[in-house]
Amino acid sequence: MTPTLSSSADVLPSLSNMSSETNLLPIQQIAPQLGLSADDLIPYGHHMAKVDISALRPSGPQGKLILVSSITPTPLGEGKTVTTIGLSQGINRLGYRGVACIRQPSLGPVFGVKGGAAGGGAAQVLPMEKLNLHLTGDIHAISAAHNLAAAALDARLYHEQRLGAVFSQQTGMPLLNIDAQQILWPRVVDHNDRALRHIQVGVGGGTHGVERHDHVEITAASELMAILALSESLHDMRQRIGRIILAHSTSGQAITADDLGVAGAMTALMKETIHPTLMQTSEQTPVLIHAGPFANIAHGNSSVLADRLGLQLADYVVTEAGFGSDMGMEKFFNIKYRQSGITPSCVVLVATLRSLKANSGVFDIKPGQPLPAEILNTNIPLLSQGCANLKWHINNAKSYGLPVVVAVNCFPDDSPEELAFLADYALSAGAIACEISEAFAKGGAGTTALAQRVIDACAHASPPVLAYPDNASLEQKIEILAQRYGAREVTFTPQARQQLDSITAAGFGHLPLCIAKTPLSISADASLKNVPHDFVLPVTACAVSAGAGFVRIYAGDIMTMPGLGTQPAYYHIDIDDEGCIRGLS
């Protein structure tokens, strides 16, 4: 690999206003690139439209799916979304029909530390502010549907306790006998708000409801978000929502959304969410955005329907899995592929020189603090240490049976010596290719070499090999993944053990796992950097997502409601008199 890099002076100033300076095409002019007509679109303004899923055909030629993952994330960012968008642009420049599939950003990270998720520079989704803030309203619809079920639970609990046996006489409905201590369905909001992690509802008693302890989660953690991402049709979504276990009765029986009589109304609120949203990149190429489950506390992939639509309409679909290969990629194979049969042809692992050095574990990197000179300057020994993390992720991706291409997300001042070392290391570690990506600086022009490598790698695809069989016990599945992570043993709290036994007894032992853990380490301990070995994986809680079709395994102290830091992104966001939003990234 002999990279030719632009200087920062040549590139970066012209990118600062990319979002506002790019000439956007009407979305009706983007759709024909995928063979879509105006009749296939449900317009949302000039530059966004939902694609009616009636455009899906039951059979026909299928494109190839490229799954983008990364090394263990660092506060520096690896540029996975930039690479995903840039790679799709590069594929289009090579004369193929390419489309990217990404998740809808949550407002929590947008206003928190991470910021938006539109990509950046010359490889981003536009209009960026529409993507990052509301898009077509799917997350709000999910929040409304989720909170309707929560309100219905508390209302039924209140009325049954108030009326007793008279409730059935008045309503003709059976008593559910909801156990107030076994309500499993919290409320949600699409913000980071740590003050809502522990709350009391029904305070005041009497007509105010039944007082009980509860909590609020971020909408991206809602089972409804996972259901949207995994559904094959509106009918499938309705059936899945009906299977959600909301609570248990005083006799221990599961109470579902269908039992509560709220599943139909929830689905009605989410009706329009079933259609993926079409937007454009900074090079006026198509992007499909659909669903937004986090990869640390959920399964971390965009929707089955978006992928299916892309595979029907394009030669190559570039889809992104959240966080490192131990998170979103693992869940793609063991949950999304297992349920849908959608098969990637290649895995792309994104890394940067800086993040590899940070993964060495030598430095404690914190957001907003100056980087040590050793990370910014040429330092082959430090890079070599951090490359052990890359090797682990290459081997992890290869364990699923697919070819792996390493994409080096390049900075203008990256050392050619370090880039050459990294290319040699990646190939010796088992990657089929290693290529730089200058997507941020050059868009598709900076990714054509990478795109060709990826297209070539797709020719070597074979059926994926899953980490564990369906008929393994839940404990066996946990142990298999823990061993892959490098754990010495798995421990279970008494609560987790009881929950695991109950889930198995209820007939859900065949389901795949969704491990909720820190994304900042291959282990469940964020302080264990690089490639941890011989650690203990602590399972603290387990729960079944019967509608989504997986069992959630909480490893360590996992928060399903993030908090805001001391310097959240909202400090930098404002709007001018013409309505132009500034500071959103």
UniProtKB/Swiss-Prot annotation:
Keywords: ATP-binding, Ligase, Nucleotide-binding, One-carbon metabolism
BP GO annotations: tetrahydrofolate interconversion
EC number, as in UniProt: 6.3.4.3
The keyword S-adenosyl-L-methionine belongs to this UniProt entry's keyword annotation: no
One Pfam entry name: FTHFS
Record's keyword annotation contains Nucleotide-binding: yes
Catalysed reactions listed for this entry: (6S)-5,6,7,8-tetrahydrofolate + formate + ATP = (6R)-10-formyltetrahydrofolate + ADP + phosphate
Gene Ontology molecular function: ATP binding; formate-tetrahydrofolate ligase activity
Chain sites annotated for binding ATP: 74-81
CDD domains, sorted: FTHFS
InterPro entries the record matches: Formate_THF_ligase, Formate_THF_ligase_CS, P-loop_NTPase
HAMAP family (UniProt xref): FTHFS (MF_01543)
Family: Belongs to the formate--tetrahydrofolate ligase family.
Protein name per Swiss-Prot or TrEMBL: Formate--tetrahydrofolate ligase
Species of origin: Yersinia enterocolitica serotype O:8 / biotype 1B (strain NCTC 13174 / 8081)
